[in-house]
Amino acid sequence: MVKVTFNSALAQKEAKKXEPKSGEEALIIPPDTXAVDCKDPDEVVPVGQRRAWCWCMCFGLAFMLAGVILGGAYLYKYFALQPDDVYYCGIKYIKDDVILNEPPANAPAARYQTIEENIKIFEEDGVEFISVPVPEFADSDPANIVHDFNKKLTAYLDLNLDKCYVIPLNTSIVMPPRNLLELLINIKAGTYLPQSYLIHEHMVITDRIENIDHLGFYIYRLCHDKETYKLQRKETVKGIQKREASNCATIRHFENKFAVETLICS
């Protein structure tokens, strides 16, 4: 039988080695702290770079907000802007030469024809928008017309040719928006039954307009993406030659107490 014994002196010596000295302190580092403080240098973003990125983001958001505001204002004016009044009405006129005096009692009854059109009045902006549909019987062309009193311009859009024509506003023919509005209200109420005459104006096409931005919002809206030309008034000649008339667009419309036949010739 073998008896196993331990040397007590050796055990005490090993225990003394494991104990810290009286003048020393034990430093204990938590494992989590070591994991947080020890980062990969590639993952550390410099302070200046972070600040520059923040400024770029702020400027980008500011530009986006400005674009949304400006775009919203433009879309509101383009789509949501409604005219003060919209009217669909007509006027009767004599197709023959203008008769200002009373006809004799035995004279035959005058041959009246009718023009019907849509009229939108933007009174605050000083603009009249006239839409002439395809006539049923008259030999005239459909068109959209803008009279801009602020820009002092008139624009015709020939719907058959899809071309625009611009000319200075003729205030002797076109009523101002407020006066035209009163006339239309009276026609609608039946207090004024228009039976009028037809006057003629003859225009010729001159130069092409490459940039229409300066023509105002309403004319730009009418003529955007269309070939646009300048017009020049020509002295009306009684009995226009057929060859000349064949090269003309004929637009019959009214924005006064009388009807107007506009010839636009190349």
Curated annotation (Swiss-Prot):
GO molecular function term, any single one: amyloid-beta binding
Residue ranges crossing the lipid bilayer per the database entry: 55-75
Glycosylation positions in this chain: N170
GO biological process terms on file: negative regulation of amyloid precursor protein biosynthetic process
Disulphide-bridged cysteine pairs: C164-C223, C248-C265
PROSITE patterns listed in its UniProt record: BRICHOS
Modified how: The ectodomain C-terminal part of the imBRI2 is processed by furin producing a secreted Bri23 peptide and a mature BRI2, membrane form (mBRI2). The remaining part of the ectodomain of mBRI2 containing the BRICHOS domain is cleaved by ADAM10 and is secreted (BRI2C, soluble form). The membrane-bound N-terminal fragment (BRI2C, membrane form) is further proteolytically processed by SPPL2A and SPPL2B through regulated intramembrane proteolysis producing a secreted C-peptide and a BRI2 intracellular domain (BRI2 ICD) released in the cytosol. Glycosylation at Asn-170 is important for cell surface localization, but doesn't affect furin- and ADAM10-induced proteolytic processing.
Entry keyword Cell membrane: yes
GO CC field: endosome membrane; extracellular space; Golgi apparatus; Golgi membrane; Golgi-associated vesicle membrane; organelle membrane; plasma membrane
Domain BRICHOS, chain residue ranges per copy: 137-231
Record bears the keyword Amino-acid biosynthesis: no
Lumenal side of membrane: 76-266
Family recorded in the similarity comment: Belongs to the ITM2 family.
Function description: Plays a regulatory role in the processing of the amyloid-beta A4 precursor protein (APP) and acts as an inhibitor of the amyloid-beta peptide aggregation and fibrils deposition. Plays a role in the induction of neurite outgrowth. Functions as a protease inhibitor by blocking access of secretases to APP cleavage sites.
Stated name of the protein: Integral membrane protein 2B
Native source organism of the sequence: Sus scrofa
